[in-house]
Amino acid sequence: SGADLQNANMHRAVFKNCTLTKTNLSGADLSYANLNGNKLDKAVLNNAVLYRTGLRGADLNYASFAYAKLQEATLDKANAQNADFSYAGMSYSWLYKTDLTSAVLTHANLYNAKMQNAVLTNADLTSANLSRSNLQHAQLNGARLDRAMLDDADLSYADLTLTDFGRAFKDNAKF
């Protein structure tokens, strides 16, 4: 934990029962890696490449993924409270039952993301692209979605209590 692995090439690496808390993985290539169930709390993964990376059930609380590439990554059931995903590319990613309470997802690209039952309580999704995303049964209470793109998104049965849609784009969105 706390190691400096900036720009490391860990393509297809498999991590088992690892504690990577506070590890600096900025710019690292973790595409196709298996990080399922590992501890990455407070890790820094800014500008990292995590294409199709497995993060299922991982602890990502307070981790930073700013500008990271997480396309088609699997974050199902991950704990990512207070994590920073600002400007992250997360299109086609899997976030089923992921806990993103108070996470920052400003300007994140979540196009066609699978986010059923995700917890986004008090999350900041300002200017995020959620077009065609599936947010069925998601908890968005207190979330901020000002200027977010929700075109063709499915928010059926989502908890939208005190959700701030501001100037969100909602063409053909399902509520």
Label for each model-derived stretch:
Residues 1-175:
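Tandem repeat scaffolds
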